[in-house]
């Protein structure tokens, strides 16, 4: 089959959507042709996709988005999640239809075979885009987590967990659409499945002396591929101030992180910290850690797979609802939003985690229990294809 992805990534919106789709693509590339359709990308991401997928199509926004089209609209529906409306700047119907025509034209140039499946992972696109693409693509799959606009799709995937997970898309998708909801359908890289086979569930610890030596007071810090608010440096600054604690830390930033030089200078002052730039070894770094300070989003499920507790600072609006719910269920510690959390709150949370290993162990075990650890790494893509071809 020919499987196409419509997805974007940038310093501003982050790289999570791109990496999620690339993970899905790698689950099926042995048997299917994969095309990515993207707007302008950071250079290193463009190179990554060119090396990873069969075809990369880059869209020129100037060909389909005029000044008059830069008006946005949020569709009204009875159960639209009002708390996330401001997170999604949905393109007007006219702009979405123009973009669909542009995508079809580009696809026709690149291949004589229309996509059998189009997977759309994009907050600015909704039903008008998908309906227009149906003229050329056999099946439509949408990846979403906002539930704030309608989708004309055959399958909808939302890997996140909410209090109303099973009802939040009512009225927003066709009645016959297959819904793949919750962390059972978490999209994880093959490396996390491989590394997690070496993980055993942490016992509930009775004292600080019971911590396994290789996990003792070792902190992992990571806020994704771009970290536009530079929360990483804020956290490292607080780690620097913890003079009375003995710990080590791995600090991880992605290829789109814009403050590498300043962070390198800061980390170099501390022999108990190691900086990793655009590392492929996140599962191994998670294996080493006692706990992690990081963002929400897909990293919730990576930590859960690796049985690692998270102290979470949300860096995007779409991370808040799931993180709040996981915090309520004692599956993570939510410190707050990146723009609002204070240095004192970060420091106190780190001190709590270092002083309370048994409570951190409970959080890790609770999060791990949300996932199905028996399924194979291609489970999500296999389920999508089976749902469409059944």
Q: Language-model features: where?
A:
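A short, glycine/small-residue-rich beta-strand->loop->alpha-helix junction that serves as a flexible
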Residues: 8-20, 44-45, 120, 230
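Donor-nucleotide binding loops and adjacent catalytic segments primarily
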Residues: 197-289
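A short, well-ordered alpha-helix in the C-terminal region of glycosyltransferases
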Residues: 352, 359-373
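C-terminal alpha-helical cap of glycosyltransferases
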Residues: 373-390
């Amino acid at each position: 089959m020919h499987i196409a992805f419509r997805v974007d990534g940038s310093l501003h919106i982050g790289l999570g959507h791109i990496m999620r789709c690339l993970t899905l693509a790698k689950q099926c590339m042995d048997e299917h042709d994969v095309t990515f359709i993207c707007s302008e990308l950071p250079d290193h991401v463009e190179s990554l996709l060119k090396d990873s997928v069969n075809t990369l199509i880059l869209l020129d926004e100037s060909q389909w988005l005029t000044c008059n089209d830069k008006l946005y609209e949020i569709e009204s529906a009875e159960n639209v999640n009002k708390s996330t409306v401001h997170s999604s700047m949905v393109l007007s119907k006219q702009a979405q239809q123009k973009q669909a025509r542009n995508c079809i034209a580009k696809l026709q140039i690149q291949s004589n075979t229309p996509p059998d499946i189009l997977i759309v992972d994009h907050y600015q696109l909704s039903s008008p885009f998908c309906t227009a693409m149906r003229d050329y693509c056999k099946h439509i799959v949408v990846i979403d987590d906002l539930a704030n606009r309608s989708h004309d799709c055959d399958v909808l995937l939302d890997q996140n967990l909410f209090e109303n997970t099973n009802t939040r898309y009512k009225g927003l998708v066709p009645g016959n659409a297959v819904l793949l909801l919750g962390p059972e359908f978490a999209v994880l890289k093959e490396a996390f499945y491989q590394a997690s086979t070496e993980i055993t569930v942490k016992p509930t610890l009775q004292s600080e002396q019971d911590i396994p030596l290789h996990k003792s007071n070792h902190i992992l810090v990571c806020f994704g591929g771009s970290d536009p608010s530079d929360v990483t440096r804020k956290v490292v600054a607080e780690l620097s101030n913890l003079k009375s604690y003995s710990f080590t830390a791995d600090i991880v930033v992605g290829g789109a992180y814009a403050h590498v030089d300043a962070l390198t200078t800061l980390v170099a002052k501390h022999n108990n910290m190691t900086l990793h730039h655009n590392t492929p070894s996140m599962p191994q770094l998670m294996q080493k850690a006692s706990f992690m300070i990081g963002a929400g989003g897909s990293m919730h499920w990576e930590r859960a797979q690796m049985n690692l507790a998270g102290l979470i600072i949300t860096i995007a609006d779409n991370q808040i609802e799931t993180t709040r719910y996981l915090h309520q269920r004692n599956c993570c510690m939510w410190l707050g939003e990146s723009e609002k959390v204070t240095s004192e709150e970060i420091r106190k949370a780190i001190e709590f985690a270092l002083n309370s290993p048994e409570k951190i162990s409970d959080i890790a075990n609770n999060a791990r229990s949300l996932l199905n650890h028996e399924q194979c790494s291609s489970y999500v893509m296999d389920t999508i294809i089976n749902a469409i071809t059944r």
